């Protein structure tokens, strides 16, 4: 269905967010048709923390990066790279901060982590 819409001559622009393999198929399917194309494809967004970072702020950045919207965003910080010299301290702070996250109703503004769809 998606390819039928993307290749339809009445469609002037295709915007797709999803997997790299499907993005490649879409790009191949509309090649040569003169359509505008925007692809936001799967990847692994990394949080990188160096030893000169303000660690508490970096912890908050990591928490927001992975838990915002239950992690269901295309740019969720799904990888964490920490300079070796601060890794132990940073991970300890991150673990401590994670224990304070409030799990509950995603519609409650005070909830940090709500329900996650697994199907």
What are the roles of these predicted feature ranges?
Residues 1-15:
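A structured beta-alpha segment of the ubiquitous adenosine-cofactor-binding alpha/beta core
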Residues 13, 19-119:
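ALDH superfamily catalytic-core signature
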């Amino acid at each position: 269905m998606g390819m039928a819409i993307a290749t339809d001559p009445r469609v002037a622009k295709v915007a797709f967010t999803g997997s790299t393999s499907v993005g490649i198929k879409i790009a191949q399917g509309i090649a040569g048709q003169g359509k505008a194309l925007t692809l936001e494809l799967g990847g692994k967004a990394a949080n990188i923390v160096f030893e000169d970072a303000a660690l508490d702020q970096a912890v908050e950045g990591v928490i927001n990066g992975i838990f915002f919207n239950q992690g269901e965003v295309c740019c969720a910080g799904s990888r964490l790279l920490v300079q070796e010299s601060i890794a132990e301290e940073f991970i300890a702070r991150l673990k401590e901060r994670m224990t304070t996250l409030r799990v509950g109703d995603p519609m409650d503004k005070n909830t940090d982590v709500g329900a996650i769809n697994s199907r």
